[in-house]
């Protein structure tokens, strides 16, 4: 429509080849009848002498604003919704704006066309033009493109490491932690599975970046399970695919939030691409098929259930969580035997305030001064896990805050012999630069502290010199955003947990950097650029590759 209308310079009414145009006075409905009532749901009018934006009392913006998907005022006795928030409506008066509207699509000029709209025909004709044709798939872009799976062959003589499940929300710090866990010798840590929780700092699709990192490190054999999209009690009971973002909205969209996490701060495409991707199909309830509808992304609970079938009493599972506790809470609630299978839980997160000046890190919710993000993003899950009676070690915000970008980078700069060490150095350098130069990225240092859980789990405690203490705690989860996620000391009714109070920072930096620099269990394919070179070279080996740790 835009291109057609702009071809006529004197066309003031937007006339075009594809739709009939008409000027209308419209508005977007933000409230519902009856209008003019003082409803606490409406921030434009409630407790205001003058309506916001000079809106009209009694106009279409002065009624009840829908609160949630199951707002009782919006549900009729028949069960159907009667609210119109978000509708576009023709109206008049100062609450409306005059715009040019396409009122009807014009029929196809080609009477023999199977399509009944002119813009359908035109759209397909433009897409099929040979000019500027795109190559949208690696198989057409690269002459020798081939999919490979790198499966680690672990000799039985080398097994015996602690079985670990890593529960992450795909923040930058989680990827740093995953690199470290994959570098720890399998005799110490045997990473059995990765669970991703989309209730934290990244969207669901970022699971593909997890697959890419595992592919880079030659561990396509490690299963990845997808957790719930919403925090506990935030999904719609009738339609679980929808829900409330009461807590998730605290994560910024940009500026160190979803956009940066989803792209790993612009570095995600530097990782080699894994054949494993998020897959789903209409047959399994998805709105459309992905490239491989015969496959389906396993859920977190499914991965857990498959894993528990393969472990025995001698090798109970250790869980390391680096994000909201949504997935672990669901496992505890649904698997009654989980307490006998889980040996210990290491939780990176939580804040136990020592005074008014000792505040948390919820910088987007001014009313909540003393919570930490991983607890706040799903407070009910945090309460379920921390008060479950499991053997829990908490690695709180205060301990994480001791980490320094510059000190860590100074140690990494001294030696970067492996692809993974070079990638980690680039990511940390970018986080530090943003932290120093951009006011809206002042929270970048909290991602650095997230690596402490992995270091504490897989590092040499003689080098780390940890200091522990025991506390009895409880978690606030009352539905009040100003209090949810707070962890309080309660010596009478609280649950006992261990708290990592302090570590030797120099030992942590040394443990992290030296492990990444170790050429054992190093990257199988170092970067996407290296992968491109392979795809432009005739193959000389089988499509499925097995790798043995040396």
Swiss-Prot record:
One Pfam family of this chain: IU_nuc_hydro
Subcellular location: Cytoplasm
Listed InterPro entries: Inosine/uridine_hydrolase_dom, Ribo_hydro-like
Gene Ontology cellular component terms for the protein in this record: cytoplasm
Keyword Membrane listed: no
E.C. number(s) listed in UniProt: 3.2.2.-
GO MF terms, alphabetically ordered: hydrolase activity, hydrolyzing N-glycosyl compounds
TM ranges: none
Keywords, ordered alphabetically: Cytoplasm, Hydrolase
Job description of the protein: May be involved in the degradation of nucleosides.
Assigned protein family: Belongs to the IUNH family.
Classification via PANTHER family: INOSINE-URIDINE PREFERRING NUCLEOSIDE HYDROLASE FAMILY PROTEIN, NUCLEOSIDE HYDROLASE 3-RELATED
Name of the featured protein: Nucleoside hydrolase 4
Organism: Arabidopsis thaliana (Mouse-ear cress)
GN (gene name): NSH4
